[in-house]
């Protein structure tokens, strides 16, 4: 079974780096633990935000706080099931290692810098669900910016 590595981070890189971006796709929907985490948190796929919503920040204005929190709990569930998070704590080194392994990113790569910045920005947050969604949103937004700037070049 394929390891569910850096769930949303890897998905963000693949989704935004590929020519066939699918902004309507639900965040995390391609991973094995997605359905399990939805069930554990009483959500359906329709309740989960799309990549486009999250990368643009629209999820913050288009949804109630309860929806934001529940989506964050699904993200945290997937991260925790893969050993990338325990409660509200990241395993930063494992995240970086898995990220580099999965993406082939090299030291100095802007994608790694974005991941590090997003982890730093959210590391002191105590609510595991909110922390997870904000981390995912940060990485997706950074990926969108990096993809747009590389397309413009």
Swiss-Prot record:
It is found in: Secreted. Pfam families: PBP_GOBP. InterPro entries: PBP/GOBP, PBP_GOBP_sf, Pheromone-bd_protein_Gp-9. Its main location: secreted. Residues 1-19 form the signal peptide. It comes from the Eukaryota. One of its GO terms (biological process) is response to pheromone. Disulfide bonds join 37-77, 73-129, 118-138. SUPFAM superfamilies: Insect pheromone/odorant-binding proteins. GO terms for molecular function: pheromone binding. Keywords: Behavior, Disulfide bond, Pheromone response, Pheromone-binding, Secreted, Signal, Transport. GO terms for cellular component: extracellular space. Homodimer. Colony queen number, a major feature of social organization, is associated with worker genotype for Gp-9. Colonies are headed by either a single reproductive queen (monogyne form) or multiple queens (polygyne form). Differences in worker Gp-9 genotypes between social forms may cause differences in workers' abilities to recognize queens and regulate their numbers. Belongs to the PBP/GOBP family. This is Pheromone-binding protein Gp-9. It comes from Solenopsis pusillignis.
């Amino acid at each position: 079974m394929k390891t569910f590595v850096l769930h949303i981070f890897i998905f963000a890189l693949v989704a935004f780096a590929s020519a066939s971006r699918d902004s309507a796709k639900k965040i995390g929907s391609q991973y094995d633990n997605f359905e399990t985490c939805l069930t554990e948190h009483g959500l359906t796929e329709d309740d989960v935000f799309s990549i486009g919503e999250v990368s643009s920040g629209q999820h913050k204005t288009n949804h109630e706080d309860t929806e934001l929190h529940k989506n964050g709990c699904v993200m945290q569930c997937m991260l925790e099931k893969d050993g990338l998070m325990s409660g509200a704590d990241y395993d930063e080194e494992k995240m970086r290692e898995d990220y580099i392994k999965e993406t082939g990113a090299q030291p100095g790569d802007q994608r790694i810098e974005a991941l590090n910045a997003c982890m730093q920005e959210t590391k002191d947050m105590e609510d595991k669900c909110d922390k997870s969604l904000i981390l995912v949103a940060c990485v997706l937004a950074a990926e969108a910016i990096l993809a747009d700037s590389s397309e413009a070049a």
